[in-house]
UniProtKB/Swiss-Prot annotation:
Coiled coil: none annotated. The lineage of its organism: Eukaryota, Metazoa, Chordata, Craniata, Vertebrata. Residues 324-342 have a biased composition (Low complexity). It is found in: Chromosome, Centromere, Kinetochore; Nucleus, Nuclear pore complex; Lysosome membrane. SUPFAM superfamilies: WD40 repeat-like. It comes from Bos taurus (Bovine). This is Nucleoporin SEH1.
Amino acid sequence: MFVARSIAADHKDLIHDVSFDFHGRRMATCSSDQSVKVWDKSESGEWHCTASWKTHSGSVWRVTWAHPEFGQVLASCSFDRTAAVWEEIVGESNDKLRGQSHWVKRTTLVDSRTSVTDVKFAPKHMGLMLATCSADGIVRIYEAPDVMNLSQWSLQHEISCKLSCSCISWNPSSSRAHAPMIAVGSDDSSPNAMAKVQIFEYNENTRKYAKAETLLTVTDPVHDIAFAPNLGRSFHILAIATKDVRIFTLKPVRKELTSSGGPTKFEIHIVAQFDNHNSQVWRVSWNITGTVLASSGDDGCVRLWKANYMDNWKCTGILKGNGSPVNGSSQQGNSNPSVGSNIPSLQNSLNGSSAGRKHS
């Protein structure tokens, strides 16, 4: 049973992203009105806007939370070619603002020459690290060496993807068996379309990221990409939002079967492909156990996908833009359905139209 709560977001333009914090009690939204808003959930379950400020001089494409171990920290990225890191400060006891909080900009990352289309904090076991991707086809990875000083970030890696980048996802696995890994999607729509998803892995010996795999079957523009939480699996699961929803498994090939020293090779299988949205899919998001995938698309619906014990993925629920379930939704979908959804109550936030995310 799903309960829908409509929120008057009060953004002055299209909302591109909605992000929940680790505990799910705080939410951040960003918009083409150049602002970010922070929302807090009250004991009664109502969401209240507790902060709103102009963050960039262009549309804000994405906003994301750091792990709370590092404090209340947000990152945002924009068409203005920058990414920014924000920290919430609580007024000191001798301050007129005692006990009141406000957000301060800790740094602006200005290395990109084009629109910065996504920003993601690395899994916390890697320390305080941040990845950005840009329309110029470069993924940049930054590190804050002193987590108490968020004004100092050093550019550690630049990864050239050869294609305009639209989205990134860190592999969340904290297993020592898995090297740090980042997946990159492209929404490049040029006719000489290459594969739109690349996966890069960190090599301890060279201290650089190297391309491990390319998903050759994904040739349509990719709008979102998400590794599932790992929870001890020996393989990885990757969801992709393109003209439909696709779920891939990546199973590492045993090291002795591959050339030593190079990046891990994977057996890649597509385990589900859903076109039930009958439209572009803009966002995919996993639950905390990596067992349920939510997708949203231009059909105005959020769809929920789950695998059964036979590893067949099914649609287990459909929510319309107003939050109401669609009749018979639990029967719909199979391992070849599709996905799509936007949520008017958050002004198409999950839809996140990428119009103009490139440099003009």
